[in-house]
């Protein structure tokens, strides 16, 4: 019981998780800066080498290797070991593969490898150079997980594997992404740094200008590469290698022969084909994966008139034909994860190789000295051969003979052992010469090794020679092309859109769609698909290259390119704005819709219930970044109850504002200033406390009408409302009643020509040709009335007009609109 300690759970959890984090950082996901290997990779290579599963021998079942690795060094499950082994065999993920594998080891399409019982593996030839001299006490060893066997903590690494094959992994609080590089270039940089320990980054980059991905491609951004080599972090653009191929009949196709590193080819082909299926860019006929054993090839066949460069730019921008590669060069350096630059990686590798060469030389020197000692004894024996033979013959046994040799002739234990085990044929004159030559060779070797151990310059010459030997044997050309500047992809979106005629429809409730002329002409206007409680407010023929602007009662504007509208039948309801616009409110309604060809010029005027008015420029409505998911403001409302009453393009005429209490004010539209989208505007009319604006319209005719909520209608002359200035109260156009007073429901201009453009949100709906402007009124009981406005007689300003029916006063007006 004395060993039991009381500790808080908080302290225990923190301390234990700290241990766990340290373990997975050092022992799982991050590579060592010296050999560039994670522990599982190192264990795989060491175990296969220890078992003799090397490149000069036959392949061995992967399952056997995995079992040995798991049983002796890595008790974390066979899947993780096999996955790591397979990855080291994939030539599209490693610049130099470390494991050779027979059988299905996966593919660039993301296909899984065959089970380990079906595949065979062995170390590659270059992997042997990572393990070279490991038997010569060159690296430290540690006990394995069950203290039954020792394993190396690092490999000798005769080439800089961390840079050559790169690394990627995620640990607790750390992640690493080190790109692969060309073996020749890396070795050239190491050799230069050996000769120039304080070499500048710029000079090193003359030898190692950038990554070299096994999948090739084009790497753009020299400044970012330099930043990454300096700080350990950076980002470059990796672009596919493409070419435009001419076909018969004037057609073209885009051929992709190299894709960015770590991009799944099958997913890439699917994404490109999705662009074709969804017609995001017109002109693509077919997408084919024509890859075979000779290499990668993706063919994107185009229509005859398609703009191949524009389509290619679109695919580069919106698919993984072009990606960003983010450098995050983190490695374990002296048991600590560090973000390292190129100079640190190279200097750490050189320091590691220095230790390896010195320890190897010490081992070889000790071995040579031991052998020299034996050879010296054997040569001495040959000079007194008869005496030695006589002594051995007179001895009782081997041990007695050894003791007699040591006592009588002062031989050492090792020399005595060699003498008594000497075979008789070795006593020929030929063997004497051989021993003398061996003695000379051993003395020369010891001198050389002593120089390596004692003289740093000699040691570095050995290091450079060995690196150059690796380069000579395994060098291959660079696969990735380097370009200094990242090219900005510019897409002429207009050229991507096929120009087609279509009909656009919008309802007050926010449903919109586009319909082909064929579907539109096959139906009548009344057959439009809509909800029973909704109202069609806009139908217009347009082109798919044009733009739709929707202005709402809450002061928001929604932008939609017409080609992005859902193409539906005329009888379909359409897509509701709430499906895409996240800030579209439940009570929000569409007030006005407009189709524009460009945003170069044009003004709009907006009038709110609170009597404020503003003009704003169409240029400010050019597409914003988040237009697909959010609307933007075109006017700021004064309070939550305020609403926009009227919005329309500005014409150079007077404006006439009519309030619910019957006040009318007329002033020039030029009095209204042009303001930004976020402003609330200026006061258009001076309202009483209990009043609000009912209607606003441009004066384009000699008369206008006023409809009250009780169904009373009158027509009066515009001149009865003289032009004045904005922000005044205006004149009454209704006579005040003590009981059941009239309130303005709708007011607007009376046109002599029904096709004339009117400052009213309903005029865009196409109707059958008529010479009369009609007012449609629907009562709260559902009764519909139609009145030809031009047939109304002019009334006095102070009159309340006439009821449109005998019963309308009791029913009251629900909806009113002109057409």
Swiss-Prot record:
Enzyme Commission identifier(s): 5.6.2.2
Function description: Topoisomerase IV is essential for chromosome segregation. It relaxes supercoiled DNA. Performs the decatenation events required during the replication of a circular DNA molecule.
Swiss-Prot/TrEMBL site (Interaction with DNA) positions: 38, 74, 76, 87, 93
InterPro entries (UniProt xref): GyrA/parC_rep, Gyrase/topoIV_suA_C, Topo_IIA-like_dom_sf, Topo_IIA_A/C_ab, Topo_IIA_A_a_sf, Topo_IIA_dom_A, TopoIV_A_Gpos, Type_II_DNA_Topoisomerases
EC main group: isomerase
Organism: Streptococcus pyogenes serotype M6 (strain ATCC BAA-946 / MGAS10394)
MF GO annotations: ATP binding; DNA binding; DNA negative supercoiling activity
A single GO cellular-component term on record: cytoplasm
Family, similarity comment: Belongs to the type II topoisomerase GyrA/ParC subunit family. ParC type 2 subfamily.
Residue stretches in coiled coil: none
Residue positions of the active site: 118 (o-(5'-phospho-dna)-tyrosine intermediate)
Keyword set, alphabetical order: Cell membrane, DNA-binding, Isomerase, Membrane, Topoisomerase
Tree of life domain: Bacteria
Site residues (Transition state stabilizer), renumbered to this chain: 117
The protein's name: DNA topoisomerase 4 subunit A
Transmembrane segments: none
Subcellular location as annotated: Cell membrane
Membrane topology label: Peripheral membrane protein
GO biological process: chromosome segregation; DNA topological change
Catalytic activity: ATP-dependent breakage, passage and rejoining of double-stranded DNA
Keyword DNA-binding: yes
Gene3D superfamilies documented for this protein: 3.30.1360.40, DNA gyrase/topoisomerase IV, subunit A, C-terminal (2.120.10.90), Topoisomerase II, domain 5 (3.90.199.10), Topoisomerase, domain 3 (1.10.268.10)
Residue ranges annotated for the Topo IIA-type catalytic domain, each copy included: 30-496
């Amino acid at each position: 019981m004395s060993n039991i300690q009381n500790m808080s759970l908080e302290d225990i959890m923190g301390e234990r998780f700290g241990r766990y984090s340290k373990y997975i950082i050092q022992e799982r996901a991050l590579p060592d800066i010296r050999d560039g290997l994670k522990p599982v990779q190192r264990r795989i290579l060491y175990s296969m080498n220890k078992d003799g599963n090397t490149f000069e021998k036959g392949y061995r079942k992967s399952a056997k290797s995995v079992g040995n690795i798991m049983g002796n060094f890595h008790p974390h499950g066979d899947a993780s070991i096999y996955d790591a082994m397979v990855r080291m065999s994939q030539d599209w993920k490693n610049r130099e593969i470390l494991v050779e594998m027979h059988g299905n080891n996966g593919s660039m399409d993301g296909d899984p490898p065959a089970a380990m019982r079906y595949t065979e593996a062995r170390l590659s030839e270059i992997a042997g150079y990572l393990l070279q001299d490991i038997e010569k006490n060159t690296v430290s060893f540690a006990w394995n997980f069950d203290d039954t066997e020792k394993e190396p903590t690092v490999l000798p690494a005769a080439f800089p594997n961390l840079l050559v094959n790169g690394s990627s992994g995620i640990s607790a609080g750390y992640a690493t992404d080190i790109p692969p590089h060309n073996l020749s270039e890396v070795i050239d940089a190491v050799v230069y740094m050996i000769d120039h320990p304080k070499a500048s980054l710029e000079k090193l980059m003359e030898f190692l200008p950038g990554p070299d991905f096994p999948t090739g491609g084009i790497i753009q951004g020299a400044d970012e590469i330099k930043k990454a080599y300096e700080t350990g972090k950076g980002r470059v653009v990796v672009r596919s290698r493409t070419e435009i191929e001419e076909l018969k009949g004037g057609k073209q196709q885009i051929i992709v022969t190299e894709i960015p590193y770590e991009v799944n080819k099958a997913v890439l082909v699917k994404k490109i084909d999705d662009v074709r299926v969804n017609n995001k860019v017109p002109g693509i006929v077919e997408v084919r994966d024509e890859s075979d054993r000779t290499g990668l090839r993706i063919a994107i066949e185009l229509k005859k008139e398609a703009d191949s460069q524009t389509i290619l730019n679109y695919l580069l921008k919106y698919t993984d034909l072009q990606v960003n590669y983010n450098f995050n060069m983190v490695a374990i350096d002296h048991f600590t994860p560090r973000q390292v630059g190129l100079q640190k990686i190279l200097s750490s590798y050189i320091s590691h190789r220095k230790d390896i060469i010195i320890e190897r030389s010490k081992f070889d020197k000790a071995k040579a000295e031991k052998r020299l000692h034996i050879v010296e004894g054997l040569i001495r024996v040959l000079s007194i051969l008869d005496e030695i033979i006589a002594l051995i013959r007179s001895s009782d046994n081997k041990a007695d003979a050894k003791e007699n040799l040591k006592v009588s002739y002062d031989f050492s234990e090792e020399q005595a052992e060699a003498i008594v085990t000497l075979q008789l044929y070795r006593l020929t004159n030929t063997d004497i010469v051989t021993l003398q030559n061996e003695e000379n060779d051993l003395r020369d070797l010891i001198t050389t090794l002593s120089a390596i151990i004692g003289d740093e310059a000699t040691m570095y010459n050995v290091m450079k020679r060995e690196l150059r030997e690796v380069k000579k044997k395994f060098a291959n050309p660079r696969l990735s092309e380097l370009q200094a500047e990242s090219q900005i992809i510019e897409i002429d979106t207009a050229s991507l859109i096929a120009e087609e005629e279509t009909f656009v429809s919008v309802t007050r409730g926010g449903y919109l769609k586009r319909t082909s002329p064929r579907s539109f002409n096959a139906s009548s206007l009344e057959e439009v698909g809509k909800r029973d409680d909704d109202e069609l407010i806009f139908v217009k023929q347009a082109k798919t290259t044009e733009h739709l602007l929707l202005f709402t009662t809450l002061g928001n504007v929604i932008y939609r390119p017409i080609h992005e509208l859902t193409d539906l039948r005329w009888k379909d309801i359409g897509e509701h704005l709430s499906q895409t616009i996240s800030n579209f409110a439940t009570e929000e309604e569409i007030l006005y819709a407009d189709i524009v060809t460009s945003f170069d010029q044009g003004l709009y005027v907006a009038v709110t219930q609170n009597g404020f008015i503003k003009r704003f420029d169409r240029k400010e409505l050019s597409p914003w970044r988040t237009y697909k998911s959010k609307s933007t403001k075109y006017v700021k409302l004064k309070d939550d109850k305020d609403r926009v009453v009227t919005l329309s393009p500005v014409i150079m005429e007077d404006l006439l504002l009519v309030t619910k209490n019957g006040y009318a004010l007329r002033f020039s539209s030029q009095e209204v200033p042009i303001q930004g989208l976020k402003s609330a505007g200026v006061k258009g009319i001076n309202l009483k406390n209990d009043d609000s604006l009912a209607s606003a319209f441009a004066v384009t005719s000699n008369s206008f009408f006023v409809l009250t909520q009780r169904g009373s209608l009158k027509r009066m002359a515009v001149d009865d409302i003289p032009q004045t200035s904005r922000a005044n109260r205006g004149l009454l156009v209704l006579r005040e009643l003590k009981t059941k007073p009239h309130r303005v429901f709708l007011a607007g201009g009376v046109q002599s020509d029904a096709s004339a453009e009117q400052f009213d949100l309903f005029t865009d709906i196409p109707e059958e040709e008529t010479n009369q402007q009609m007012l449609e009124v629907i009562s709260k009981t559902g009764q519909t009335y139609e009145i030809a406005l031009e047939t109304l007689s002019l009334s006095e300003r102070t009159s309340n007009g006439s009821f449109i029916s005998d019963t309308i006063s009791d029913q009251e007006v629900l909806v009113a609109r002109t057409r």
